Structures are given as structure tokens and as C-alpha cells.
């Protein structure tokens, strides 16, 4: 699948994002690479293969969890087209 301007515009509208004109070609190229990779994965013959949740024997490796101060919410929200408090504000699409 090739990502063209029409599809990119549709994705912009659905995601409520605005892609700058100087980044459009780069984004189209990156999205095309992602779709091509998924197409390659779809070609794999997995008949008879059992689903694997984790390849690590003995469970998941754990790390120590320690709280740290972060301003990640403010960084993310400054890119939002609309926000209410510390949340994204999106248009209602379902009645």
C-alpha cells in the first residue's frame, strides 16, 4: 500500500493532528515503510505455530519501580489541538 496525500489527509483528520507541509513527504515515507513491514509479516506462514506471549523463560524480567518527578504530561499536552485540564479534548463522534 502506498501512502499518498489523500490518505495522509484522511489520517490527519481522523487523528485530529496537523502535519506541517515541510514534514509531509517524510511522514509519507515513514508510514509506507511501516505498512511494507506489516505486509512482510503477513506473508509469514504460521500454520501449526503456537502463539507465544513471551520468549523469556520463567516469566517477565522485573525492574525496581521508583517514582520520579516528570513533566511529561505538560510536554504531551502542549501538542494537543484542544485540552481540558490535564486531558485531551476530542470532538464527540458517537451520539
From Swiss-Prot:
Matching SUPFAM superfamilies: Glu-tRNAGln amidotransferase C subunit
Keyword terms, alphabetized: ATP-binding, Ligase, Nucleotide-binding, Protein biosynthesis
Physiological role: Allows the formation of correctly charged Asn-tRNA(Asn) or Gln-tRNA(Gln) through the transamidation of misacylated Asp-tRNA(Asn) or Glu-tRNA(Gln) in organisms which lack either or both of asparaginyl-tRNA or glutaminyl-tRNA synthetases. The reaction takes place in the presence of glutamine and ATP through an activated phospho-Asp-tRNA(Asn) or phospho-Glu-tRNA(Gln).
Family: Belongs to the GatC family.
Lineage: Bacteria, Pseudomonadati, Campylobacterota, Epsilonproteobacteria, Campylobacterales
Paired cysteines (S-S): none
Encoding gene (name): gatC
Record-listed E.C. numbers: 6.3.5.-
Membrane-crossing residue ranges in chain numbering: none
Highest taxon of the lineage: Bacteria
The protein's name: Aspartyl/glutamyl-tRNA(Asn/Gln) amidotransferase subunit C
GO molecular function, one term: ATP binding
Any single GO BP term: translation
